[in-house]
Structure formats: structure tokens, C-alpha cells
């Protein structure tokens, strides 16, 4: 029983295998009825523990692409080749039945405090469930009771308006905020996790409505600002600043650091819960992810000025462009001086493991975790920095941004990274061109989101809500290469690391020879020099802001209707 509870507490894998056997022996599902269950706190906890399996997988969190990461393995969202499927994992409803089953019979628990707490847990997860559904499909059926196969509701109910469903989501989150515990726990949902989720949900919905021409966006942004401000003022969470590389430590730490992290997926070798972030970031066969040049350019100089205001920035090589930058740059990608955890040797970017030359190190632990599926560092789901950024953006979108908001949100994030934290007076032209807006504060907030939340699964949603899906079609650029057939030192240790060529590989010891042009995945922007290009066909269209309803669901219930552009 204890092993089962620990397993589910981590919220990182579906209930199964030997870790569930004790629990299933004690509470066989064929005898789990409303009359004999949900009477005690242990029973309520045991049942609701399974809800934690709804959280995104590790690869979904760190494996994002959007317009920030290039890799060889791409999702249909990025490729733009999604068609109307027969079925879809994102249209599954089983977890909703489990949640509603609990809420229907939780009154069996006579202890009101316990009952309300676990109803808060269930409603937190129902809000999470429906937020994901609305992001993917827009209008969806709202169901607040358990339904089984054969229930007429399955065949007759159409989709409810997005507005109605989102109001229900907010009602669930408000209930969770009121009834969940205030004590910190990175592995269990709390009041602070509910406020952080409400902050995320309301920012998404408010800005999606604003940039997609829907009404009532102001009320959602006001709700975001209110929830975020309460979190900032009352939760006690803050930006983690310990050590010389606090940003990197926040993600490479084996155990979630609860100074800043509100909710995390836990991993534990002892009970077989592991992921593969080390392999993903270092292997030559797992997609070869690399930061894109357009995002690398967004990292500021330490004095707070844009990198793109430096003379000659367009043709700087990696060692030069890494100097005097926002500390998060060197804590996100390999730059001169980088050493693996528990190693004293300098590690240059490996072009066989990264498509762009900007090899990622966020989350990366020591080399002993490099083998397949061996990583055990916890992965953050909600953290204080995101809530701060949500607050800043909501206030900016509402026209209520000022120095006080800047100082409570953007300044501490930049100062942790060793960047001068003053609020800029003029808009950065590079950002204006990239995002197509002129507001200086809004641009700086978008800069911070791109940098601070990179590889945390937020970027695709950001582009969708800002109505910037076309960014997924842009050319992918990597590091600048001055010339072909010339070996380069990428990490400044005096030893050459890489050479780009159209001919045969050379034989200089320690140099990786990268073929460009012809049938290679690579080319150079100006044929013989320039930014590294990685080209793959992508086709984002307006209809891809929402997914199509699966055909099987429409066959069963035509009243669901298909999303407009997918008809």
C-alpha cells in the first residue's frame, strides 16, 4: 500500500504493473461501489491519486518545438499536416468520468474538512482536463456527472460554447483555491497550485480572445491579474537565487526546489519512474534538438541592452556572441566554459546531437544519466516565475503596467540572470519586427517568456493565443559559420571542434566534419558562409488554431459538429 501511494503521489505514470497490485487487492474494482468507498481520508486520497496521471509526460514538457527549437522529429502541429483523424488521444474522456464519479459520491465522507479538500483536488483536475480540451477544440461538451457506455448523453449532447465551459473551469478553480491545503507540496495540488493554474488559464483565454477577435477578453485578464497578484502576495514562493547557476540548478536538481517550484512531476529510480531528458539532449538519434537563432538573439547583454544592438552581431560566432550575455544563455545552451555536472572537462557543442549548434543543457544532469531512460530529476509543472510573467502580461494587455509591476515581475527574473533590471524606455526593433507589436513593455514580457519558460511546454500555447501560428512556418537558423572547410573552436578552449564542408571529411583530431548542401539536412545561408540552415516543410494554416473533432466521435454523435475550417 505504501509503495502504491508513493507511486501515484509522484503523478508521473499511469497506474499499472506491480506497484498497483497491493491497492487493487485491497480495493478490487469490481467491489468499489458508492456504498463501500469514499468514507475515509485514506480512501479519498487513494482514489484521487490516480488523477495525477493526467499531467503531461516528461517528453511533452521538455520536448517542445514551436518556433524556439529545431529537431528532426516533429509533431503534426509543427509540420502542419494534421488531417481529420478517426480517433485522437486528446479527445479521450475516461478521466472525466473518474473525476465526476468521485464528486458524485464524495458526500460519503462524513468529515467535512476532508471531503472539501478532496473535492478541491477533483475540481482542480477537472479544470485541468477541460482547459486542455478547450485549447485543442474550442467548444466542447460540458459534463459534470459520470456517464457510461450506452448513456444517451453520449449520442445526443452537442458541444457547449467555449465561454460557458471556461466559466465552469474558473468555478472549479475557485473552489479548489478555497478548499485545497495552504501547506507547500511540490507533488500534491495545493491552494497555490490552483492559483497558479488559474493564472495560466485566464491569461490564455483572455489573450486568445483578444487576438482572435472574441468578446469579453478583459474579464479573463482581470481574473488572471487578480489570481497572480494573490499568489505573489500570499504564497511565499519566490525566484530561486541560490548558487552561481540558479536557473540551471532549478531544472537539473534531482528533487524539485520548492522555493520557486509549486508543482512538479517526481521521478524516482527506486520505484522505476524515470525519463529521458539526458538522452534527448545528448544523443545523436533522439531528434538532435537545438535552440533556434531567432530566440538566441533575444537574450540581452548583461547591461540590459539588446544583443541585436551590438555592432556586427549578425556575423558573430558562438564564442563571441556568448560574451556578457544574460546568464540564462549559458545555463540553457553550451557556451565557452561549459562543463557537465560532476565533470571537470570542457564540453563543446556536439553538432551530431544538435541541429543548430546551440546545444541545450537545461535539465541536463551528469553523464551517468545519459543512457536510455535513466534521468530522475523532477520536472516542474507550475512555478512562481510563470505566475509573475502571467501577472506582468495581463497588466500590460489591460493597459495597467507600471514600474511597480515591472519591479515585482521582470526585474527579479533578470537580476537572477545577472542582467541589469531597469525597465527599458524604448521598444527593441528586433522584437517589434518579430512579434508585430509596438508596445515596449509587452515586447519585453514576450522576450522573458521565450527565455525564462523555454523547454517547459508553454511556447506553442503562447503562439496560439497571440495568433502567431505563422511563426511555425519560418526558416530555421542556427549558429553563424564564417567559411567552409575551416575548423572552428566552439567553446574557446584552443582546440578546434567542428568544420563545415561540401567535400570529403578531413582528418584533424577532435574535429567533427559536418556536410552541408546537396542531400545533407544542412546548408549555409549564403552557400559558402552564413547562418546554418535546417529546412523542413511546414504548413501552418488558420484552421490549425483548433484541432478537428475525430471522425469516430462524429459518427457516434453528429450533433457534436466539426470545427469550422475542418468541415
Annotate the PLM regions.
Residues 92-93, 168, 247-301, 374, ...:
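Long, intrinsically disordered, low-complexity segments
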Residues 21-75, 174-175, 188-195, 200-351, ...:
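An aromatic- and glycine-enriched ligand-binding surface/loop that stacks and positions planar moieties
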Residues 16-19:
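C-terminal motif of bacterial Sec signal peptides marking the signal peptidase cleavage site
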Residues 134-135, 141, 184, 204-213, ...:
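Short coil/turn linking the two alpha-helices of tandem helical-hairpin repeats
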Residues 42-49, 55-57, 72-137, 153-167, ...:
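Conserved, well-structured interaction surfaces
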Amino acid at each position: 500500500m505504501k509503495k502504491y501511494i508513493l507511486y501515484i503521489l509522484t503523478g508521473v505514470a499511469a497506474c499499472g504493473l506491480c506497484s498497483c497490485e497491493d491497492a487493487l487487492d485491497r480495493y478490487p474494482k469490481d467491489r468499489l461501489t458508492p456504498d463501500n468507498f469514499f468514507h475515509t481520508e485514506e480512501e479519498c486520497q487513494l482514489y484521487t491519486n490516480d488523477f495525477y496521471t493526467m499531467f503531461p509526460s516528461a517528453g511533452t514538457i521538455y520536448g517542445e518545438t514551436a518556433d524556439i527549437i529545431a529537431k528532426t522529429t516533429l509533431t503534426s502541429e509543427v509540420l502542419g499536416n494534421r488531417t481529420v483523424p478517426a480517433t485522437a488521444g486528446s479527445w479521450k474522456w475516461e478521466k472525466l468520468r473518474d473525476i465526476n464519479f468521485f464528486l458524485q459520491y464524495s458526500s460519503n465522507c462524513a468529515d467535512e474538512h476532508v471531503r472539501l479538500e478532496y473535492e478541491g483536488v477533483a475540481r482542480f483536475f477537472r479544470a485541468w482536463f477541460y482547459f486542455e480540451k478547450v485549447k485543442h477544440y474550442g467548444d466542447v461538451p460540458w459534463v459534470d456527472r459520470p456517464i457510461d457506455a450506452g448513456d444517451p448523453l453520449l449520442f445526443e449532447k452537442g458541444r457547449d460554447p467555449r465561454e460557458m465551459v471556461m466559466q465552469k473551469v474558473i468555478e472549479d478553480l475557485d473552489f479548489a483555491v478555497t478548499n485545497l491545503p495552504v501547506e507547500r507540496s511540490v507533488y500534491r495540488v495545493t491552494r497555490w497550485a490552483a492559483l497558479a493554474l488559474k493564472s495560466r488559464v485566464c491569461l490564455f483565454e483572455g489573450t486568445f480572445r483578444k487576438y482572435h477577435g472574441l468578446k469579453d477578453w478583459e474579464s479573463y485578464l482581470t481574473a488572471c491579474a487578480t489570481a497572480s497578484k494573490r499568489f505573489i502576495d500570499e504564497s511565499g514562493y519566490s525566484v530561486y537565487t541560490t548558487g552561481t547557476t540558479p536557473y540551471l540548478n532549478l531544472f537539473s536538481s534531482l528533487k524539485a526546489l520548492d522555493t520557486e517550484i509549486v508543482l512538479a512531476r517526481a521521478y524516482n529510480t527506486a520505484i522505476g519512474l524515470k525519463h529521458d531528458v539526458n538522452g534527448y539532449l545528448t544523443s545523436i538519434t533522439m531528434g538532435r534538438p537545438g535552440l533556434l537563432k531567432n530566440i538566441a538573439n533575444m537574450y540581452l547583454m548583461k547591461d540590459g541592452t539588446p544583443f541585436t544592438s551590438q555592432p556586427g552581431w549578425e556575423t558573430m560566432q558562438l564564442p563571441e556572441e556568448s560574451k556578457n550575455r544574460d546568464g540564462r544563455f549559458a545555463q540553457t545552451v553550451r557556451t565557452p566554459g561549459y562543463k557537465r555536472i560532476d565533470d571537470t572537462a570542457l564540453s563543446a557543442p556536439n553538432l551530431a546531437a544538435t541541429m543548430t549548434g546551440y546545444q541545450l543543457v537545461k535539465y541536463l544532469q551528469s553523464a551517468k544519466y545519459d543512457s536510455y531512460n535513466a534521468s530522475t530529476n523532477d520536472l516542474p509543472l507550475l512555478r512562481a516565475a510563470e505566475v509573475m510573467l502571467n501577472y506582468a502580461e495581463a497588466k500590460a494587455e489591460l493597459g495597467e503596467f507600471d514600474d511597480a509591476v515591472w519591479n515585482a515581475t521582470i526585474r527579479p527574473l533578470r537580476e537572477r540572470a545577472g542582467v541589469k533590471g531597469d525597465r527599458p524606455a524604448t521598444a527593441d526593433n528586433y522584437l517589434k519586427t518579430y512579434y508585430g507589436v509596438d508596445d515596449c513593455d509587452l515586447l519585453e514580457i514576450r522576450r522573458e517568456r521565450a527565455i525564462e519558460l523555454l523547454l517547459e511546454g508553454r511556447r506553442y500555447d503562447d503562439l496560439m493565443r497571440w495568433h502567431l501560428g505563422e511563426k511555425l512556418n519560418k526558416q530555421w537558423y542556427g549558429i553563424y559559420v564564417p567559411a567552409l572547410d575551416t575548423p572552428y573552436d566552439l567553446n574557446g578552449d584552443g582546440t578546434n571542434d567542428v568544420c563545415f564542408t561540401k567535400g570529403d571529411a578531413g582528418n584533424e583530431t577532435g574535429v567533427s566534419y559536418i556536410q552541408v548542401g546537396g542531400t545533407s539536412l544542412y546548408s549555409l545561408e549564403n552557400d559558402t558562409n552564413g547562418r546554418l540552415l535546417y529546412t523542413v516543410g511546414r504548413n501552418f494554416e488558420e484552421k490549425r488554431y483548433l484541432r478537428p473533432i475525430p471522425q469516430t466521435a462524429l459518427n457516434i454523435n453528429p450533433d457534436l459538429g466539426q470545427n469550422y475550417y475542418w468541415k
